[in-house]
């Protein structure tokens, strides 16, 4: 662990406890949670955050929406004049999702542009033979220009280690000079830990939808801090992933993207986990998967390959998680000629060209504090690839070009 990251975690009261909550903090949290529950019951029915785009695929994109009270919701797909072309529900086993606060709508895409809004009505009664509704609300109309897997160019933005500094999302997104951001990757540690659904809405979903997420799909890469807290096991349901896995791969534009889930930084048997984790076997599972996807036809059809993973396994620390990530993934990547591995975690930005240790570029983003924040821009057109590590003020740190 780097000196700066150590100081940051110490200042947050997280060092040495693996982000576990001290006894006093726990009782305070429980008091607040109880207070939140009573508040939620009395608050008005509304969007908890604006709709947000997930899981961009060749034939569809997922629109997620979250509300303050249980409801029945749907997506209206619109034409250029705002006329409803199609109404889309979340359907499973013949039932339209209802009487819940969170929805995922799989929306077919026939081209690059999609215009939509989300509509919902509060459920006031959901009895076996009688369902009643209350107030109906709708979001603003949003127009998203979506990338296609077979298009010749793509531009993507990668952020990391926001650690609940909510204003950083808009600041870094707007500072980026990319004309279009086809995808945004949040490369881990958006949180200190996750205790309630309100953590997700207030610390992530509200700021990212205010900035970009209703029109630019984002990929939530799990960092080691997202694994912590009593809501960590519910975390994934608020996002959408191929095959419902944090680790996944896809081709978008000329780039084949591989997203790894680096897991925790400490050994599985560490006391802070209380016997509840098994990241070593999970990383071995990913290794077997990684060996297959790197040989896939989809990967071979791409001109570039970029790996996004939170914990860097080069130019980092000697903690167990770092070393086990290296043991699982480095040789596989080394033998399959990837272009770059992009990470965060250390809270110290760094750039490393291929050398005797690794034949791919290693980029590590900075930390959450003002003056140490960074963003990474990835641009590709045909056989040309450009990746830049940039300070929050727009000053380039370093980058590389290919083709």
Regions found by a protein language model. Name each.
Residues 153-227:
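Conserved, compact domain cores that house catalytic/ligand-binding motifs in diverse enzymes
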Residues 2-158, 163, 178, 389-403:
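Acidic, histidine-bearing metal-coordination/catalytic regions of metal-dependent phosphoesterases
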Residues 320-321, 354:
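Substrate-binding cleft/loops of secretory-pathway carbohydrate-active enzymes
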Residues 158-160, 184-189, 218-224, 306-310, ...:
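Active-site neighborhood of phospho(di)ester-bond hydrolases with catalytic His/Asp-centered motifs
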Residues 297-317:
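Short acidic, glycine-rich surface-loop motifs adjacent to enzyme active sites
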